[in-house]
C-alpha cells in the first residue's frame, strides 16, 4: 500500500540529454563560485592533489561545493522539466 502511494507521488523524470548536462554543469559552476565567495577557510583539511586545479580548495570544500551543486542542479532540472523547458 505504501509503495503504491509513493510511486504515484514521484513525478516522471527526464531522460539524460546534453541540455540536462549543461544545466547540471552550470549549477555546479554556480555552487563553486558561491563557495569561493563564502567559505572562509577554503584550504583547511586534506589538500587536493593539484590544488591550483581545484581553486585552492581543500577536500572538504570540494566535496561541499560539489554536493551543493548537485542538489541545486537536481532541483533546477526537476523544476525546468515541470515547467516544460527541458
UniProtKB/Swiss-Prot annotation:
<keyword id="KW-0472">Membrane</keyword>
<dbReference type="GO" id="GO:0031676">
    <property type="term" value="C:plasma membrane-derived thylakoid membrane"/>
</dbReference>
<keyword id="KW-0602">Photosynthesis</keyword>
<comment type="similarity">
    <text>Belongs to the PsaG/PsaK family.</text>
</comment>
<keyword id="KW-0793">Thylakoid</keyword>
<dbReference type="GO" id="GO:0015979">
    <property type="term" value="P:photosynthesis"/>
</dbReference>
<dbReference type="InterPro" id="IPR000549">
    <property type="entry name" value="PSI_PsaG/PsaK"/>
</dbReference>
<keyword id="KW-1133">Transmembrane helix</keyword>
<feature type="transmembrane region" description="Helical">
    <location>
        <begin position="14"/>
        <end position="34"/>
    </location>
</feature>
<protein>
    <recommendedName>
        <fullName>Photosystem I reaction center subunit PsaK 1</fullName>
    </recommendedName>
</protein>
<dbReference type="InterPro" id="IPR037101">
    <property type="entry name" value="PSI_PsaK_bact"/>
</dbReference>
<keyword id="KW-0603">Photosystem I</keyword>
<dbReference type="GO" id="GO:0009522">
    <property type="term" value="C:photosystem I"/>
</dbReference>
<feature type="transmembrane region" description="Helical">
    <location>
        <begin position="61"/>
        <end position="81"/>
    </location>
</feature>
<dbReference type="Pfam" id="PF01241">
    <property type="entry name" value="PSI_PSAK"/>
</dbReference>
<keyword id="KW-0812">Transmembrane</keyword>
<dbReference type="InterPro" id="IPR017492">
    <property type="entry name" value="PSI_PsaK"/>
</dbReference>
<dbReference type="InterPro" id="IPR035982">
    <property type="entry name" value="PSI_centre_PsaK_sf"/>
</dbReference>
Amino acid at each position: 500500500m505504501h509503495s503504491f502511494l509513493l510511486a504515484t507521488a514521484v513525478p516522471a523524470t527526464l531522460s539524460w540529454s546534453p541540455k540536462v548536462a549543461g544545466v547540471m554543469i552550470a549549477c555546479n559552476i554556480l555552487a563553486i563560485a558561491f563557495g569561493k565567495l563564502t567559505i572562509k577557510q577554503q584550504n583547511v583539511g586534506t589538500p587536493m592533489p593539484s590544488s591550483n586545479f581545484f581553486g585552492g580548495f581543500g577536500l572538504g570544500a570540494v566535496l561541499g561545493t560539489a554536493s551543493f551543486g548537485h542538489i541545486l542542479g537536481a532541483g533546477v532540472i526537476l523544476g525546468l522539466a515541470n515547467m516544460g523547458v527541458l
